[in-house]
Amino acid sequence: MPDYLVVLESAWTIRDADSVDDAISIAISEAGKRLNPTAKFVEVEAGILSCPYCEEELPCTLIVARTALVGVKMEMKVYKADSEEHARRIALSTIGKALRDIPLEIIEVEEL
């Protein structure tokens, strides 16, 4: 039974954000707080986008009227899964229970 690395993307809404860095810090902190009791083994970091014109890496954050939408990337290692699909379901179930109302999408599954 192989091990897998499952990478998920989530969207966090942050109110009263003063800057992009502030919004990212708050989103990562909130994700960590929610994941800590049940899924503290999940790696959380800020999402990154590539500019289609200059290919420069940019933070995955948008602020309008002091409300930010922050893309957060989460990585979870799933051990001894039956298949890639099984690893996806395990990761979604584990992280989804901790982040009940946060939208999640799997962006990559890699066999270790």
Swiss-Prot record:
Any Pfam family: DUF555
Highest taxon, organism lineage: Archaea
Entries under InterPro entries matching the protein: UPF0212
Family as reported in the entry's similarity comment: Belongs to the UPF0212 family.
Name of protein: UPF0212 protein Mhun_0078
Organism the protein comes from: Methanospirillum hungatei JF-1 (strain ATCC 27890 / DSM 864 / NBRC 100397 / JF-1)
